[in-house]
Amino acid sequence: MLETKDLNLFLGNKHVLKNISLSIPVRGEIIGIMGPNGAGKSSLIKSLIGEFNATGTKLLYNKPIQQQLQHITYIPQKAHIDLDFPISVEQVILSGCYKEIGWFRRPNKSARDKLKQLLSDLELETLRHRQISELSGGQLQRVLVARALMSESEVYFLDEPFVGIDFSSEKLIMTKIENLKQQGKLILIIHHDLSKAKQYFDRIILLNQTLRYFGDSEEATSVTRLNETFMSSTDCSDPSQRSNITC
């Protein structure tokens, strides 16, 4: 179980996340995180993985999430990647297995076999020796996904994986995400394209500083729910406004 209770985050004087409480079983499921710009979507993920110092309870498998990071893989927005760093596609992907084999060990046969399969599945074979600075947006995103899949995690966080990429790359990436779901993994994806929300996600978290809704993707994309999320703001100093949704 992935759980938060009364999660609050301040960045400077801004109250970015207000009293977020969630309870999500770790099972084969793809969950979207959606809301307007500045709603706190990326901040929620960064709070969960410890990049931001949010207050409140954060648990994975009934233990503090900071003690369980070996079970989590995070794929940041590709815009945050340093493209000037001299590293090849193959080296980036192989770095995904270092938390399991150690930073100073050569990848074993199992890792090499997995690399070969991922290069094939994500159509990166001809790019394996390219520098990441030479890649298109879609190619780079496929590399980041391949890197994430080198590790055996239970929970995957993806921050806007489909922004600025071609349809072919999006389709390849979504196929791998569906495969993770079939393996019983929990995948949470920050996403902005409402037209594909019902197609991609089993359930959706609607966020705008507070938790506006968490549940069925059909209901989440209804006019009523979207208006509540995208067109309003709530003063959550009032305890009655606290979000506490368990599914």
Give, region by region, the residue ranges found by the protein language model.
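Conserved ABC ATPase "signature" region
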Residues: 109-127
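Conserved ABC ATPase signature
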Residues: 131-135, 139
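Catalytic Walker B motif of ABC-type/P-loop ATPase nucleotide-binding domains
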Residues: 156-159
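Helix N-cap at the start of a conserved alpha-helix in ABC-type nucleotide-binding domains
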Residues: 167-169
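H-loop/switch region of ABC-family ATPase nucleotide-binding domains
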Residues: 191-192
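H-loop (His-switch) and adjacent beta-strand-loop-beta switch element
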Residues: 204-217
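ABC ATPase nucleotide-binding domains
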Residues: 218-247
